[in-house]
Design a protein with these regions (language model features):
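Membrane-embedded alpha-helical hairpins and interfacial helices in multi-pass inner-membrane proteins
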Residues: 1-238
Length: 240
């Protein structure tokens, strides 16, 4: 099987998985929160354009994770999917004079929809709430882990198929690069929840400056990571 056919099969499987979970979410969703959903959607879409290039991987990472997690925690599964899909479309929309890659857009939308729906269903699952040691913090941790796996596993698989490589080392590299950010994202989301319970969600969503700071920090960190191999090559060339 050639790479092109394998990629198309993976994208098709991802679309089917996303459609299946979205259909289930439509049945299982709880009460809607239109005003909060709109506010989270606007902030998630704005921060989705704040991207950093992942070194060693053909892809980038957006810093809107806390808003996606906020949607997972506070909104219905359907609302979380809508917020995620629209902000993902904004993130992946090509810049001026660039051509839209429909295949890539289809994969990204279905992958993010599946991951967001999975995280939302896990967070609101009755079996998780019924555990003797269950808490909102535990539910957030499990939901964040579900979102992480729902995003990174399909990405590693599609990259491996397109480049003819093993998916495991690609996923491991993605984990090393992005897992700390998921931990930070869960922490920011927990902070938003704490502020929201005392001062209201309107003030809690004012974490945009925090996300901008995280964005700048990751830009500097990854740029230094990318520069280190280049400097090593130059040193070896100079000593040759």
């Amino acid at each position: 099987m050639n790479n092109t056919r394998r990629i198309r099969m993976l994208i098709g499987a991802m679309i089917v998985a996303a459609a299946g979970t979205a259909a289930y979410a439509g049945v299982a969703s709880h009460a809607l929160h239109p005003y909060l959903a709109l506010a989270v959607l606007v902030l998630a879409s704005i921060t989705s354009r704040m991207k950093v290039k992942l070194p060693g991987v053909n892809g980038n990472m957006s810093v809107n994770l806390p808003f996606l997690l906020t949607a997972v925690v506070n909104l219905s599964a359907v609302e979380a999917i809508i917020v995620t899909c629209i902000s993902t479309a904004v993130q992946c929309w090509p810049r001026k004079n660039a051509k839209l890659n429909l295949q890539q857009m289809s994969f990204n939308l279905s992958m993010m929809s599946f991951a967001s729906c999975l995280a939302s269903l896990v967070f609101h699952a009755q079996w998780l709430r019924a555990l003797p040691w269950s808490s909102s913090t535990l539910a957030l941790v499990v939901a964040t882990g579900s979102l992480f796996l729902g995003q990174t596993a399909p990405v590693a698989t599609i990259v491996a198929a397109s480049e003819g490589r093993n998916a495991w080392p690609i996923w491991r590299n993605l984990t090393q690069l992005s897992f700390p950010y998921y931990v930070v994202g869960a922490g920011v989301t927990s902070m938003v929840q704490a502020v929201s319970s005392h001062l209201g969600w309107e003030l809690a969503l004012a974490v945009f400056p925090v996300m901008y700071g995280i964005h700048r920090s990751y830009q500097l960190y990854f740029s230094r990571m990318a520069e280190t191999p280049r400097q090593e090559v130059l040193v070896r060339a100079a000593g040759a």
